[in-house]
Amino acid sequence: MASALGIFIDRNIIKYAKLNGTKDKLKVESYGMKYGQNHKELLKQIIEETNSAKSNVVINASEIHYEETSIFSMLKKKDYDKAVEVAYEEITDRQKLRPELLEYGYILSKDPADPEKLHVLLGIQEKTAIETRANLIGQNANIYSQMPIGISIVNIYNGALPAIIVNIEEDTYITEVFNGEPVRVTRIGTGTKNIISTINSEENSISKSYEVLRNMVLPIDDMDQISFEGNEYAPVIVSEIMKIVSEIKNIIKKNTGIYRKIYITGTGATISNIETFIEKLIDDVECEILKPSGIEEQKRTPIKEYVDVNSAIALAGEALRI
């Protein structure tokens, strides 16, 4: 049976999930997290502990730059690559980038604003960043691909309606989904990074700081006068979430009437009441936790247990949902 290991590398944490099965019915074989900044050693441990030396490994790409463009929808499929290449070269020329130092990939989707066009979401990365990340794995396993998490996260979403997926890791990745495809990704330097740093200054342990964060409960009774009583870390958590909410509001404002659904995932999704908290701050939307679609629920592990490693599950899905 085919299997794949998804690995999401962040500054202070590495999340992993090994999946096996077929495209529409996947099983989580193992999952977990490692804490610290010695990424090379932690990755070696993960590959050994999950017996993944011969499995396909998908890791999140680093330092991705996103661009948007379009091509004519009347083109034949065999001409898509060339049309995107021309559009990409126009972007690199305009921005005075050096294409020989870069790699790019793209996602096509229907253009909501123009039926005669296909929307193109480009992910551009420096070749040196690709090599640096590949060297972390070395000869320990086979790297199937390096994928932007802002694009891969759609692997675990199967909704038919337009939606905004908010993946709150150390940074936050906001993915706009239209017709089942990612059309725009916004990365903001707000997420759990500052929260963990604040907690760690008291706890002096990254792993314990993450556990403290996961046990947080956001107050939702009175949104006009939020009470921080009995929760010393609540102010920094609320401050970070407010910044994320502000970005979501900007996206909704630019796309009036399109997005009515928001999904929260990542470490931030483990904070109790976060979906209700955000829903109360944004008019005319529903907000819920993103449960990974296509994953077989197991008796001893309910689906909600996987939410914290959704980023890794989504990456593993790249190798199994072709």
Predicted regions span which residues?
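Glycine-rich phosphate-binding loops at beta-strand->alpha-helix junctions
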Residues: 259-283
